[in-house]
Amino acid sequence: MPDSTKIERVETILWDRWLLIRIHCEDGTVGIGEGGVHGWQRPTKTMVDTMAEYLKGKNPDYIEHHYQWLYRSSHFMGSGVQGALSAIDIALWDIKGKRLGVPIYDLMGGKTRDKVRCYMHVGGTTKNELVESAKGAVAEGFTAVRFTPFPPDYYLHKSYTEWADEAVDRVGAVKEAVGGDADICVEIHRQMAPAESIWLGRRLEQFNPFFYEDPMLPDSPARMAQVADQCNIPIATGERFTTIFEYEQLLEANATSYIRPDLCLCGGLSCSKKVSAMAEEKHVKVIPHNPLSPVSTAACVQLDACIPNFALQEYTGESEPPKSDLLITPLKLVDGYLMVPEGPGLGIELNEVALSGPENPKVLDTPIGFDGSVQDR
């Protein structure tokens, strides 16, 4: 074990639409992290800057201690607090791995796999565009695709029957296009009530989706459990959760087949590892949520590599700017699998030139229904 060092400073970087952090130690070691969710990077940055005052001069090895101190001292929790804690946790694990010269997964029980199966986001305004997007992903080697089965304006000017029929038609078209070469993953974005979720889910059973994600809001495990019980499709949910206690309620209710921890929101690698163990006890598998930057992807791969109940990894593509510019050596993607890196810590380093790029924050918005009412995003 190398001699102990102390945290010298915490750097926050608003880059494009993401919040990255670097924790600098006195011995020169720098840990990289990411935190926050779309639209809330600036408040999360403020939380990291506030927490940095506590971290200065502390030993970076005490990862769980620092998490507990900052979590318990916050009194009022939420996505801002947990997003900041997530970024700090990931960066501290990166520091520990770099100082010991090993990947993070080696510090969390060791590697359980050499590569990580990914599902690719596909989409399109029309059914034909959606089908072609799915076929393109399969041609690139992906064995799972994820999509929302309706156009952006479905909730504005259509009856439930009309857009549900359209959803069934689109799911069927994608299934026919990819056949047995790829699994299909259906994302609903919390747009339905429980009864509607059950009705549509039953209609989609014929296409054998890998999962049926967030058909309703995830804030009622009991109601989600009713959907899970009455649909013969695996439910996936949990991307909005910020603590292990929310996952505990979900799992105890038998409300899901797959949990979707967001490492940049629910407490970083530490809490995601705990949640994965909780899920393992229930024979529930893990599909990490990952809509952010390649730093988030790198953290997800470290988790995926060391848990036995990993199922799939969300992947939005990182071959185009600005994402392709962020890392000096990007993670290697081969036939729809991310290869588990062997380098220390997260196994990545940031490209300083790319970091000079401007902030491009996501604009907060949510749909307005045909009657003028606010809809969920």
Placement of each model-derived feature along the sequence:
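Glycine-rich phosphate/pyrophosphate-binding beta-alpha loops
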Residues: 14-18, 30, 34-40, 85, ...
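Extended hydrophobic packing segments that form well-structured cores
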Residues: 346-377
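Structured beta-strand/loop patches that form or line metal/cofactor-binding pockets in enzymes
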Residues: 1-32, 36, 318-324, 373, ...
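Conserved, mostly hydrophobic/aromatic
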Residues: 7, 28, 51, 88, ...
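Metal- or metallocofactor-binding catalytic centers and their adjacent structured scaffolds
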Residues: 24-100
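Metal-dependent enolase-superfamily TIM-barrel catalytic cores that perform enediolate-based chemistry
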Residues: 115-231
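Glycine-rich, aromatic-flanked loop segments that form ligand/cofactor-binding clefts
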Residues: 89-125, 129
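Shared catalytic-loop signature of beta/alpha-barrel
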Residues: 49-53, 65, 202, 208-211, ...
